[in-house]
Amino acid sequence: MSFAAGLLNATVQAATVLLLAGLGELISERAGVLNLGVEGMMLVGALGGFVVTAVTGNYWLGFGVGIACGMALAAVHAFLCISLKSNQVISGVMLTLLGTGLTTFFGSGWVQESITGFPQMTFPIVGRYLVHLPLVGEAFFRSTATDYLALLAVPVVWFFLYRSNLGLEIIAVGEDPEMADTMGVPVFKFRYLAVIIGGGFAGAAGAHLSLAFSQLWVPGMTVGRGWIAVALVVFAQWRPSRMLVGAYLFGLLDALQLRSQSLSLALDPNAPLAGVLNPLVNTLMNPQIMSTYPYLTTIAVLSYAVIRTESVRLAVPSALLQSYNREMD
């Protein structure tokens, strides 16, 4: 596999993590609940999926357990923010710290373990032909099942939110919970549902990370991807289709820094300005420097959101971060 094909394949793998986590955060925020605990939910999903796969040898069962672990931690966030009306930011950060601590403690004995996770696969019948397409064949038509599921999730989430009664009611809860309640929509129930579904997506992202992307467990292996997923929701302006674009953009940056050690862009020493450009290129392509690119891009995205305040204000759910107090007659 050429460097370019390998880079694209790694981009797909890295983008899947961000896409799943970002879609889950989007659903939660559409209901008016900010979830900053995505990082912690991804970690418990990664560890839960890895342990079950290591014990049973069944990576699908491990993937399901990873989803369940993310949903369990999300249920705690929902209880704190919806029932107890706690500050959503504080609750989310606390759950990220909790998830990090729990997985570091309980996962310490699994660091040296190896598993057989999701294998790369091709589409039935046509896949064996598509995989031979130049450049994109190896990247997009020989991936893991979770990569395909993440791509499928984009139109599914779009249809769920904008074409189903349940999705439209969730959006209504995030825009104007008082009016939704007046129309008979169970605000608390749907907010719980959205947050827990979002946690399931985060758990799936973590399970993909440990069962497909790396097929190993390392404490803190999400390395900030949960925070990037939260920023991606702003980048996407709460739209699933734009989430796909953002996930692949950040996935490319993530993959580029992972594969930068095998890349050489040195100019011919006799070329003009080679003495100036070679040190600059070597610095920019340094793996330690490149590891900061996804996070620098995240800062740039959030800065752009601040500059484009009006467009973001129009896109953000009106009741985001707002607790709902139902008035009793």
UniProtKB/Swiss-Prot annotation:
Pfam families: BPD_transp_2. GO terms for molecular function: transmembrane transporter activity. The chain crosses the membrane at residues 3-23, 32-52, 60-80, 89-109, 139-161, 193-213, 216-236. Keywords: Cell membrane, Membrane, Plasmid, Sugar transport, Transmembrane, Transmembrane helix, Transport. The keyword Cell membrane applies. InterPro entries: ABC_transp_permease (IPR001851). The complex is composed of two ATP-binding proteins (TsgD13), two transmembrane proteins (TsgB13 and TsgC13) and a solute-binding protein (TsgA13). This is Putative glucose ABC transporter permease protein TsgC13. It comes from Haloferax volcanii (strain ATCC 29605 / DSM 3757 / JCM 8879 / NBRC 14742 / NCIMB 2012 / VKM B-1768 / DS2) (Halobacterium volcanii).
